[in-house]
Curated annotation (Swiss-Prot):
Protein name, UniProt field: UPF0319 protein YccT
One Gene Ontology CC term in the entry: outer membrane-bounded periplasmic space
Keyword Aminoacyl-tRNA synthetase: no
Family named by the database record: Belongs to the UPF0319 family.
Disulfide bonding pattern of the chain: none
């Protein structure tokens, strides 16, 4: 089963897609959702970048950084989930630039008024719309796809309506049973299709690292 999935991933991803923009990931940014789709943390773990096509994009993320306390101790600061929308038309690289976050005062200020910049490959600021994603769910585990869909339907500052319904039934990820020898449960199909989607976005080094990791996993 494991070898079959890895082989399928390679076969599906060999055709070269035309990507125009490299999103450079920051170690202080925990990416949660990209363009309405939950980010595959297992595939992007340790990745330096992912590839985007030209056009509008939306990121949902948290800033996570160790800050210094007044008593010389440290703690991990985790920001509220943030939404940023931007357009990569004619842009070949996107880089995060966060404000200084070193202590409790700066963290509290960021919570109250988040700010950041996205820079292109020439360090020129990219126009962005930034907002806090207010979570409505009281569940212990938050479904960020559902929260982002609700946000995008609410005409908020960083909303992008085109991503509001993309994940309603995952129809954009399910490619049809003709690719499969047998019809597995839909949850299995969806998991594999999500994996294929993020595999295609990952840079070559990350793909190779993931495949090496997958080969070492025990067969189910």
């Amino acid at each position: 089963m494991k070898t079959g999935i890895v082989t399928t991933l390679i076969a599906l991803c060999l055709p070269v897609s035309v990507f125009a923009t490299t999103l450079r990931l920051s170690t202080d940014v925990d990416l949660l959702v990209l363009d309405g789709k939950k980010v595959s943390s297992s595939l992007l773990r340790g990745a330096d970048s992912i590839e985007l096509d030209n056009g509008p994009h939306q990121l949902v993320f948290r800033v996570e950084k160790t800050i210094h306390l007044s008593n010389s101790e440290e703690r991990l600061y985790i920001s509220p989930p943030l939404v940023v929308s931007f357009n990569t038309q004619l842009i070949n690289q996107v880089n995060f630039r966060l404000p200084r976050l070193e202590n409790e005062r700066e963290a509290n200020h960021f919570d109250a008024a988040p700010r950041l910049e996205l820079l292109d490959g020439d360090a020129t600021p990219i126009p962005v719309k930034l907002d806090i994603l207010a979570i409505t769910s009281t569940a212990k585990t938050i479904d960020y796809e559902v929260e982002v869909e609700r946000y995008n339907k609410s005409a908020k500052r960083a909303s992008l309506p085109q991503f509001a319904t993309m994940m309603a039934d995952d129809s954009t990820l399910l490619s049809g049973v003709s690719e499969l020898d047998a019809i597995p449960p839909q949850s299995q199909v969806l998991t594999e299709q999500r994996l294929k989607y993020w595999f295609k976005l990952a840079d070559p080094q990350t793909r190779n690292t993931f495949l090496q990791w997958a080969e070492k996993q025990p067969s189910s």
